[in-house]
Amino acid sequence: MNSYSHNHTTAAAASGARPSRRRIGILALLAVGTMINYLARTVLGIAAPQLTAELGIDAAMMGIVFSAFAWTYALAQIPGGIFLDRFGNKVTYFLALTLWSLFTLFHGLAVGLKTLLLCRFGLGVSEAPCFPVNSRVVSAWFPQQERAKATAIYTVGEYLGLACFAPLLFWIMGSFGWRALFISVGAAGVMFALVWWRCYREPHEDKHLNQLEREHIVNGGGMSTGAEQHTAFSWPLIRQLLAKRQILGASIGQFAGNTVLVFFLTWFPTYLATERHMPWIKVGFFAIMPFLAAAGGVMFGGWVSDKLLKATGSANLGRKLPIIAGLLMASTIISANWLTSDLAVILVMSFAFFGQGMVGLGWTLISDIAPKGLGGLTGGLFNFCANLAGILTPLIIGFIVAASGNFFYALIYIGGAALLGVAAYVFILGDVKRIELSQ
């Protein structure tokens, strides 16, 4: 800290001034953006019954439509990360938000399978930078000891968005049809993109950030001075990043967590209806419970992580331990194979999904270890590996269920993937510290 900043901060503290709370407003922007992100990608599930009937799309083709998003979403992670490092948080998120909202809106204009697939492909590409931007913004705006809680707050939008807005979305579809559903969500996203452009600033540019809050961020390891230089992309950078055990271990762990998440986003209602023989009304009621539990897991994981980091000063304990515990909890999904009570099954599923929610801390860990100037590329690599689960999990579970006629081995696969994540964090990841790359 230079002498001017030190004297300025000391004088402010002596006069009784308090740090501003501008970073909370920035976090609110991320939380709303993440909620819109997940609404845009999952609203197809609500529209599917009306949409398939009107467009004449059968179940097999609809499965391809559901998976189309994950293909381009994963493939666009690295290019999206490069773009983010080149153009920064504000421009990247504004363009991504605007484009994914327009592609969501265009779903409402689809006339057949081909146009619907084009919309899904476009949605996947345009949503790709969202979580790398989130991670990069948290790294800039929050000291290390607050990042897990901040990550948890925006991540909870993944689970609560659809649950909170489902009644409104069903009402829109029931009153105006499935096309109005996509148009409404898309229009809301475009409007929020304008809010983002108007409100977001980097810490060193934000006039609402006072000196005390600025020093709080900088002293805690936030990249808020504006002095960080963009690192030009080159293929050797990717090789160097992939060679780092921290990146490999964290990516495998996140892939494991996403395997559990994708099961709940895709096959879980079918599991309840066909394996547990629940009527659809009961499925609708019970399916909400694990998602509420997962939201609790996200918040609990963030709280525990920051508490551990503050109490011990160890990023290894503060970041790794909650994720390992969460993956172990997620692996208990296997035990549902031997339960006969529907309530017991839902409780086990909720416990497992609570644990999966804690794995969202992986983004906090990435913000801690990403090389300076390469937060976007690092986040893109990490998210690419994690979202391979979005491609593989629905296909593998579908093959298992088709071959065996039940979900017994499917649940073993999901639990086994969670245990693979535990092994990656214990034996591969190593120390949680910022990576230094050779020039």
What do the predicted segments below correspond to?
Residues 154-207:
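Helix-loop-helix hairpin linking two adjacent transmembrane segments in secondary transporters
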Residues 316-362:
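C-terminal transmembrane helical hairpin of 12-TM major facilitator-type secondary transporters
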Residues 367-404:
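A late C-terminal transmembrane helix in Major Facilitator Superfamily
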Residues 44-45, 242-299, 359, 363, ...:
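Extracytoplasmic gate region of multi-pass secondary transporters
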Residues 25-59, 264-269:
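Extracytoplasmic
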Residues 56, 88, 109-115, 126, ...:
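Helix-breaking motifs and short loop linkers at transmembrane-helix boundaries and internal kinks
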Residues 75-113:
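Conserved MFS/SLC helix-loop-helix module at the cytosolic interface between two early adjacent transmembrane helices
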Residues 119-159:
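Cytoplasmic helix-loop-helix junction between adjacent transmembrane helices
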